[in-house]
């Protein structure tokens, strides 16, 4: 018979990564009085800047149920435009033909209780409340004994715990340690540039005339794609900056013939070359997309990205005292905006299945059964979601595929109806 092991104060749960799933899990474990430690490779919460704007919708009930009441009440602190929400504004997420400016699709409006727009940075700041994050702790490896899990860091230190929970993102070091031959993400045939825009209220009017929070579209003439997302608004601050902060992302298909180039168009090397490339694409777009792109400041840093995903196999299974969560389990392309929603519900699925075992100090055999059930639940939900997001990414750069049946435009829901052979 397997010896009974216990989760004691000396052996906390080791959360690797202080992203949304890691911090939300920490908040819940704190409420359950289950010991934990959080390790993050970055230097602090501001290392990565504001990050993406996130739409939280079908995960909102889970988020609110996992947080203590006093933090759930503070969610508006993470809103991209608190004053707009207070006025009752809601996004329709309009989708345009960039070549003509014609509206192709939009979603029904939703109340604040059903859908919110937040920044990743703002949500992380909120979730980090009262959580002791151990910074600059990059994972180097993991190991197991019958009654413990050990996390080893690149500074030479190591920590022993009862369970390792990988919340360390799409390039998860934990996943790499567990699956050295199958940890890599799948690179999609798309390339992306992203830039921050600081806009006056007058400059924002062309965006606000179309939507309060978010614009997106594909050019029917060349399959380039753009989205513009509000990240911050003047009234969010006691001392108004009088500037809106928006994120503009421009992406294109990585294939022969795009934009009359014989070979696939690579990401330009220098910042100036990237700006000129965006300008060239913008000449083919309608307003307001054209002017917004042409007015990118010369000195504004333009970042680059290759969309990637990680689709867990149907029979995917971790082992020993380790489990994956969020992007570490199912990294998604951002074209359906569901990655954060899945990460939040991952935490709920873990709490429902594994926390009772941990709280009652049950042994590894019972814990492993609970973790297997958690993984089954996540794969059933997130595998179709990841594949739908992949298809949405590809469709966003093939105008002829964009219709009401494309995952790019279909309803966002927890259990995606996307079939694997689509």
Residue ranges and their predicted role:
Residues 94, 102-119, 194-298:
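Conserved FAD/dinucleotide-binding core of flavoprotein oxidoreductases
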Residues 21, 44, 171:
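Conserved Rossmann-like nucleotide-cofactor binding loop
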Residues 2-13, 56-179, 183-198, 274-275:
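Conserved N-terminal helical subregion
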Residues 15-39, 165-166, 282, 297-390:
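Conserved mid-domain beta->alpha element of the FAD-binding
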Residues 49-52, 148, 204-207, 386-387, ...:
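Short aromatic-enriched loop/helix-cap "lid" or pocket-rim segments at secondary-structure transitions
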Residues 1-12, 31, 148, 208-213, ...:
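Eukaryotic N-terminal low-complexity, Ser/Thr- and Lys/Arg-rich leader segments
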Residues 46-47, 160, 172-176, 202, ...:
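Short catalytic/ligand-binding loop motif for oxyanion handling, primarily in non-cytosolic enzymes
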Residues 41-45, 49-54, 59-60, 64:
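Glycine-rich active-site loop/strand segments that organize a redox cofactor
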């Amino acid at each position: 018979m397997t010896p009974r092991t216990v989760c004691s104060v000396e052996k906390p749960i080791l959360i690797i990564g202080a992203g949304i799933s890691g911090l939300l899990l920490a908040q819940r474990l704190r409420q359950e009085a289950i010991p934990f430690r959080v390790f993050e490779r970055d230097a602090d919460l501001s290392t990565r800047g504001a990050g993406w704007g996130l739409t939280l919708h079908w995960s909102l009930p889970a988020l609110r149920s996992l947080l203590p009441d006093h933090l759930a009440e503070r969610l508006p602190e993470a809103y991209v435009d608190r004053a707009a929400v207070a006025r009752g504004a809601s996004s329709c997420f309009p989708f345009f033909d960039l070549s003509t400016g014609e509206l192709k699709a939009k979603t029904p409006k939703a109340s604040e209780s059903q859908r919110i727009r937040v920044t990743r940075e703002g949500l992380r700041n909120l979730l980090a409340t009262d959580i002791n994050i151990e910074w600059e702790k990059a994972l180097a490896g993991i190991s197991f004994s019958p009654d413990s899990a050990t996390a080893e860091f690149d500074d030479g230190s190591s920590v022993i715990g009862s369970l390792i929970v990988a919340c360390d993102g799409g390039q998860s070091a934990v996943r790499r340690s567990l699956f050295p031959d199958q940890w890599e993400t799948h690179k999609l045939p798309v390339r992306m540039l992203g830039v921050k825009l600081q806009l006056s209220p007058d400059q924002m009017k062309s965006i606000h005339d179309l939507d309060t929070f978010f614009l997106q579209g594909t050019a029917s003439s060349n399959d380039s794609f753009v989205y513009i997302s509000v990240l911050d608004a003047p009234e969010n601050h006691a001392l108004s900056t009088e500037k809106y902060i928006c994120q503009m992302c421009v992406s294109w298909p990585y294939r022969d013939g795009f934009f009359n180039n014989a070979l696939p168009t690579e990401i330009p090397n220098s910042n100036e070359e990237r700006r000129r490339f965006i300008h060239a694409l913008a000449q083919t777009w309608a307003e307001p997309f054209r002017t917004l792109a042409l007015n990118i400041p010369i000195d504004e840093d333009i970042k680059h990205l290759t969309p990637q995903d990680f689709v867990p196999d149907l029979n995917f299974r971790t082992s020993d005292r380790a489990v994956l969560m969020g992007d570490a389990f199912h990294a998604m392309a951002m074209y359906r905006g569901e990655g954060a929603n899945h990460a939040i519900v991952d935490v709920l699925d873990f709490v429902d299945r594994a926390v009772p075992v941990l709280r009652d100090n049950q042994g590894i055999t019972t814990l492993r059964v609970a973790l297997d059930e958690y993984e089954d639940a996540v794969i059933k939900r997130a595998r179709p979601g990841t594949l739908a997001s992949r298809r949405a990414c590809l469709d966003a750069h093939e105008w002829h595929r964009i219709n009401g049946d494309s995952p790019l435009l279909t309803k966002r829901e927890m259990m995606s109806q996307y079939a694997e052979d689509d």
